[in-house]
Amino acid sequence: MKKTGKVFLTIVTALVAVVLVACGQGTDKEAEVKKIDFILDWTPNTNHTGLYVAKEKGYFKEAGVDVDLKLPPEESSSDLVINGKAPFAIYFQDYMAKKLEKGAGITAVAAIVEHNTSGIISRKSDNVTSPKDLVGKKYGTWNDPTELAMLKTLVESQGGDFEKVEKVPNNDSNSITPIANGVFDTAWIYYGWDGILAKSQGVDANFMYLKDYVKEFDYYSPVIIANNDYLKDNKEEARKVIQAIKKGYQYAMEHPEEAADILIKNAPELKEKRDFVIESQKYLSKEYASDKEKWGQFDADRWNAFYKWDKENGILKEDLTDKGFTNEFVK
């Protein structure tokens, strides 16, 4: 073999070796990507948009994780996290109270929406413009002790007699249809979904935010919770996951229509409701945070105020001051 041929063979051999090493490194890098289950609280909706954006835009991949967004099974999303079956889930501060009192190993690590956007909706023709106007009306209830205690405080805060509010079962996943059909007159909803839904369906309605009447009711709902053992053993990974989610919600704040389409892409059952989803997203994109850099952060005074109310009204026996939340991973 000529010298030039030997040189050529040497170069080719070296290049093949480099390619093989590079491929091996790529395989190793892919192997480092950790699969993580994230449990939703309900079917996909605009509370979840930032999660789908984070997945679509590759923010999770940049964090070294492959997050699988899963619908909740019959078992509560919080119970899956408590039992270590998933590290993260969506839940609610008000529902966390009883779990925390029983010693559940969960912590809220990010607030999806800065302020409580839930409240009471009614037909405009019924002229319910204050909580005291619920007196004599049919309220669709889930018969949850915390719900009814809050409603009592709400009505009485404006001088109404809670005992004169007629409570009827609300077993519908969509409260707008039974209100429109007169099954009950009022219901507790989240404006960002059911409130916008009412408008999209042409239901002329009044709406009252709970927080506008009782300051303690400006609690955090929904929130992202995590398993305490997972947080302890995987601090850096948890921080990267939450930071990726934060980027997803920040993107949704700045690009609501594109974010809505990303949600629809991942939840095709919403495709026929695109106009409604976009309106819902436009509303929530302004509610996620007043300052995008502070998305997800908890105000300790507001968190504690609700649990103090819980204790004063017999919902809780234990003092949960400063328990159940952290800003460590979201800042």
Predicted regions and their residues:
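Pocket-lining segment of extracytoplasmic ligand-binding domains
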Residues: 94-95, 174-267
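Conserved C-terminal helix/tail region of periplasmic/extracytoplasmic solute-binding proteins
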Residues: 303-331
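Secondary-structure end/capping motifs
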Residues: 232-313
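Short, glycine-/small- and polar/acidic-enriched structural segments
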Residues: 32-171, 181, 185-192, 208
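Short, solvent-exposed loop/beta-turn-alpha elements that line the ligand-binding surface or hinge
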Residues: 62, 132, 210-217, 285-300
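Bacterial signal peptide processing site
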Residues: 24-26
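Bacterial N-terminal signal peptides that target proteins for export
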Residues: 1-11
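C-terminal motif of bacterial Sec signal peptides marking the signal peptidase cleavage site
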Residues: 19-22
